Amino acid sequence: MAKIQLVAQANLPTEYGIFKMVGFEFLDTKKEHVALVMGDISNADEPVLARIHSECLTGDALHSLKCDCGFQLATALKQIQEEGRGVLIYHREEGRGIGLINKIRAYSLQDKGMDTIEANLALGFKADERNFEVCADMFELLGVKKVRLMTNNPEKVETMKKAGINVVERVPLNVGENRYNTKYLDTKAKKMGHYIVHNNDEQHLMTCPHCQEEII
């Protein structure tokens, strides 16, 4: 088990209901992660609706349309609210682990024509620098053994299984596609094996506020 510990918790009222915010910290690096917990998750035999959400300042806080992160965060919290119980782990690995400034550098390369993977490689990073094992450690500290994991990323599922977390179901999270992120989603599907279902059909183009200006 990684050297991470549960260090603080408090109630957090949100537009999706009241969550318990749980803070975790690595003993050596002092790096922090957070989990949002709703309802009673103490029954280890009952699968918990869960989401591992990697930090994305641009999508989560600044409402960027270049990715689907902000849409996934909102949808996951709403689904937990509807379920009445669940866990969202906020995984502090900005920019797939390369950090915010390098993410901006990667965006600059994408403006010049590279895709999201090519940009990371050009900067000297792997396609994905994240380590999801710490998320399994956080689940364990929360007493969660079985999850219904909201994700399109097969690596998250496999990492949880290898770490001893029983993923009984993968819940798709295909939301937020628009004309600014279709290439990004396509790249994740083709080069990273993500389970992406495109929504760029005629009905989507007619109803999506981010696509309408393209067809007027």
From Swiss-Prot:
Transmembrane residue ranges: none
Keyword vocabulary terms for this entry: GTP-binding, Hydrolase, Metal-binding, Nucleotide-binding, Riboflavin biosynthesis, Zinc
Coiled-coil ranges per UniProt: none
CC per GO annotation: cytosol
GO molecular function: GTP binding; GTP cyclohydrolase II activity; zinc ion binding
EC number: 3.5.4.25
Pathway(s) where this gene product acts: Cofactor biosynthesis; riboflavin biosynthesis; 5-amino-6-(D-ribitylamino)uracil from GTP: step 1/4
Cofactor binding remark: Binds 1 zinc ion per subunit.
Positions annotated to bind Zn(2+): 56, 67, 69
Active-site residues per Swiss-Prot or TrEMBL entry: 128 (proton acceptor), 130 (nucleophile)
Reactions that this protein is recorded to catalyse: GTP + 4 H2O = 2,5-diamino-6-hydroxy-4-(5-phosphoribosylamino)-pyrimidine + formate + 2 phosphate + 3 H(+)
Enzyme class, first EC level, given as a word: hydrolase
Listed HAMAP family: RibA
Family as reported in the entry's similarity comment: Belongs to the GTP cyclohydrolase II family.
This protein's name: GTP cyclohydrolase-2
Organism name: Haemophilus influenzae (strain PittEE)
Gene: ribA
